[in-house]
UniProtKB/Swiss-Prot annotation:
Alphabetized Pfam families for the sequence: SecB (PF02556)
GO molecular function: unfolded protein binding
Subcellular locations according to the entry: Cytoplasm
Protein name: Protein-export protein SecB 2
Stored PANTHER family: PROTEIN-EXPORT PROTEIN SECB, PTHR36918
Length: 147
């Protein structure tokens, strides 16, 4: 018996950095103070359909760090990728983009954030792994906001 059913496929076409920003705030005073940092993280995922089989995903990570309640730095990167996804439903494609593709881009974004912070004169920041599956499920279960 021959199976003529087309199998789903996934291919990474390109991984690239779309935007990088690092800003030291309150320098040089911030380097003279006792270092007692607190950081806020923001993650944003945007997808763009290029054509029926190709999609761009932008993973933006923003880190805002304060030292003793005074802003010290803001580091931001948008790491992007182009992915070819075939023979999947729209719901499956959405899931693959927001989970697997985001997980693929995260290590690249993490390295750029870490490098920017160190080159900015600060101690390295340990960005923990991100559970993109949980973020996606939360996003899918939350009510949609009207604009």
């Amino acid at each position: 018996m021959q199976n003529n059913e087309i199998q789903p496929s996934f291919l990474i076409q390109k991984v690239y950095t779309k935007d990088v920003s690092f800003e030291t705030i309150n320098s040089p005073a911030c380097f003279k103070e006792q270092w007692n940092p607190s950081s806020d993280f923001n993650i944003d995922i945007n997808t763009t359909k290029i054509n029926d089989e190709n999609f761009e995903l932008d993973l933006t990570i923003t880190v805002t760090t304060k030292n003793n309640e005074t802003n010290a730095y803001i580091a931001e990167v948008t790491q992007s990728g182009i992915f070819t996804i075939t023979s999947m439903s729209e719901e499956q494609i959405d899931s693959v983009l927001n989970t697997y593709c985001a997980n693929t881009l995260f290590p690249y974004a993490k390295r750029i954030i870490d490098s920017s912070i160190i080159k900015g004169g600060f101690l390295p920041l340990n960005l923990a792994p991100i559970n993109f599956d949980a973020i996606y499920l939360q996003k899918k279960s939350s009510p949609k906001r009207e604009h």
